[in-house]
């Protein structure tokens, strides 16, 4: 029985996955949510009648990230590093499963998608966001001294390059819909009422169910020369900028 998601498949073979955790104002990630979503992904992959899927939310926001209560339960001084790794590798494995499963997934981002929520979007092959001030994306974990652990630090630079990614990875700022489109983090910005239709339009076209970085000949935008003088200067400059903005109170 599904508690956090509903799954509906229309006559065209498009699956609509709607997140709507009961008793919460926002959807958040946790082991139970991840297990449910993993089971849904497996079902979609196994069903030859399903040609693609849309992930969206039944709440005003999309997905707010990881449940900190679950996080604290899974991480503590009583656990070994290996145990901590085992507790947190599930999300990364799930998102890699989505992007390599062979069927196209589109994210219909109706509200904020932060942290793990944005990482879910980045794992989808297509991203549509609502033209709404309350719809924005980002990886804010660094603000509380954490690291985005679901692959966001890897997918963002692979989409828009190291130089453009660094300010968002180091400062954890929110990215509005129009800016996300300009950067290349989302594909479309549409009115809120057209989100699902836009995602389905892509799925009904000729969707590519392979991420750019999994395609032959892929190159990181701007180059991947982390040891180059230019990249080193970028890292140094970004670090100095963050230190100045935070009055050296960077977590």
Task: Indicate where each model-derived feature is located.
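Conserved CoA-thioester-binding segment of acyl-CoA-metabolizing enzymes
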Residues: 1-56, 82, 93-96
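Intrinsically disordered, low-complexity segments enriched in small/flexible residues
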Residues: 31-34, 40-41, 164-166, 170, ...
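Glycine- (often His-adjacent) and acidic-residue-rich active-site loop
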Residues: 57-94, 113, 143-145
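Glycine-rich beta-to-alpha active-site loop
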Residues: 96-144, 148
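Receiver (REC) domain switch/active-site residues of two-component response regulators
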Residues: 125, 186-187
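Hydrophobic, secondary-structure "cap" segments at the distal end of domains
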Residues: 153-163
């Amino acid at each position: 029985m599904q508690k956090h998601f509903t799954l509906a498949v229309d006559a065209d073979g498009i699956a609509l996955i709607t997140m709507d955790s009961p008793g919460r104002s926002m959807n958040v990630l946790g082991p139970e949510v991840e297990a449910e979503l993993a089971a849904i992904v497996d079902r979609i992959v196994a069903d030859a009648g399903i040609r693609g899927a849309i992930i969206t939310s039944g709440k005003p926001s999309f997905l707010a990230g990881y449940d900190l209560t679950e996080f604290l339960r899974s991480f503590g001084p009583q656990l070994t590093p290996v145990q901590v790794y085992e507790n947190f590798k599930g999300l990364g494995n799930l998102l890699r499963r989505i992007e390599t499963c062979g069927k196209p997934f589109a994210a219909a981002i109706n509200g904020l998608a932060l942290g793990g929520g944005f990482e879910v979007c980045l794992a989808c092959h297509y991203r549509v966001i609502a033209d709404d001030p309350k719809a924005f994306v980002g990886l804010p974990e660094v603000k509380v001294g954490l690291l985005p652990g679901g692959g966001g630090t890897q997918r963002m630079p692979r989409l828009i390059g190291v130089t453009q990614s660094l300010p968002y990875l180091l400062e954890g700022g929110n990215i509005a819909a129009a800016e996300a489109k300009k950067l290349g983090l989302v594909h479309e910005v549409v009115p809120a009422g057209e989100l699902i239709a836009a995602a389905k339009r892509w799925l009904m076209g000729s969707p590519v169910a392979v991420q750019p970085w999994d395609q032959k000949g892929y190159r990181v935008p701007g180059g991947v020369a982390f040891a180059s003088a230019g990249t080193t200067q970028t890292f140094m400059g970004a670090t100095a900028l963050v230190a100045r903005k935070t009055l050296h109170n960077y977590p």
